[in-house]
Design a protein with these regions (language model features):
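Pre-active-site segment of Zn-dependent metallo-hydrolases
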Residues: 1-18, 23-30, 48, 81-108, ...
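Structured loop/turn residues at beta-strand edges in well-structured enzyme cores
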Residues: 7-8, 30, 51, 68-70, ...
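Active-site neighborhood of phospho(di)ester-bond hydrolases with catalytic His/Asp-centered motifs
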Residues: 9-18, 37-40, 132-136, 152-157, ...
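Active-site environment of divalent metal-dependent phosphoester hydrolases
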Residues: 18-23, 43-46, 63-65, 81-82, ...
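Binuclear metal-ion centers of metallo-dependent hydrolases, dominated by the metallo-beta-lactamase
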Residues: 35, 49-64, 146, 167, ...
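Conserved catalytic scaffold of divalent metal-dependent phosphoesterases
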Residues: 60-63, 69-82, 137-139, 149-155
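Beta-strand-turn-beta hairpins that frame and shape the catalytic cleft
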Residues: 64-73, 125-131, 222-223
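Active-site-proximal loop/helix segments of hydrolase catalytic cores
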Residues: 107-171
């Protein structure tokens, strides 16, 4: 996507404060008349980067607002953590040398763009339909999430056994459809292009009634 794809938006919902979610927000706000909704950790980061902080709205779980015919409600989320095996695999991967400059940038950015345990999920309701957007492939164990959402937007990155982790979320939430995101290699060498086929195969075998959609960059998805 290009920045031009976002300048017409009026509301921007941030799930958490990592650099891959925030880095272009100041530039978008320079071109767009938009309001950013996010938790206190994100506000703390953006207030040091954004000139006009009047467009920033702090939210917390339970906060709800209307945007046109949509109602958006904030839920508590949880960010996935790399296990030791994943950390060692990435450190020993030749990609670390190939993307060494990226690695230096990410090492610089990580402490400046903290998540601080404040990952949010968003429930979006419109026209009798309900969408649940997760910020990471993890659920807060103490939060009651809406089951049977018409669409679950599921970040597919950050676990050693992605298909198994995703299936656990599906079993808990029981969505009607799933739209995968975050499976691309956006910030190498920390990220990687994730093979979504094992999850699709598992879903076809165990939940053939639930359609799984893997979007392509630049192509709209009709829901």
């Amino acid at each position: 996507n290009n920045l031009e794809d976002f300048v017409q938006e009026t509301d921007i919902c941030i799930t958490h404060g990592h650099v891959d979610h925030l880095f272009f927000i100041p530039e978008i706000l320079e071109q767009a008349d938009a309001t950013v909704f996010a938790t206190r950790a994100v506000m703390n980061t953006l207030e040091g980067w954004v000139e006009d902080t009047g467009c920033l709205v702090e939210v917390e779980p339970g906060y709800s607002w209307r945007q046109g015919n949509m109602r958006i409600t904030v839920l508590k989320g949880k960010h996935t953590s790399f296990c030791a095996k994943t950390v060692f695999r990435k450190l020993l991967n030749p990609r670390l040398l190939r993307y060494f400059r990226n690695a230096l940038f990410l090492a610089w950015a990580h402490p400046r763009f903290p998540e601080k345990g404040e990952t949010a999920a968003y429930q979006i309701e419109a026209e009798g339909k309900r969408i649940l957007l997760l910020g990471s492939m993890e659920l807060d164990p103490d939060t009651v999430y809406p089951e049977n959402a018409d669409l679950l937007i599921l970040p597919y990155q950050g676990k050693e056994n992605m298909a198994e982790a995703a299936m656990e979320i599906v079993e808990r939430l029981k969505p009607a459809r799933i739209l995968l995101d975050h499976f691309d290699d956006a910030f190498p060498p920390v990220s990687e292009e994730v093979d979504t086929r094992p999850f699709k195969k598992a879903m076809d075998e165990r939940h053939p009634e639930i359609k799984v959609v893997k979007p392509k960059a630049g192509k709209p998805v009709t829901l």
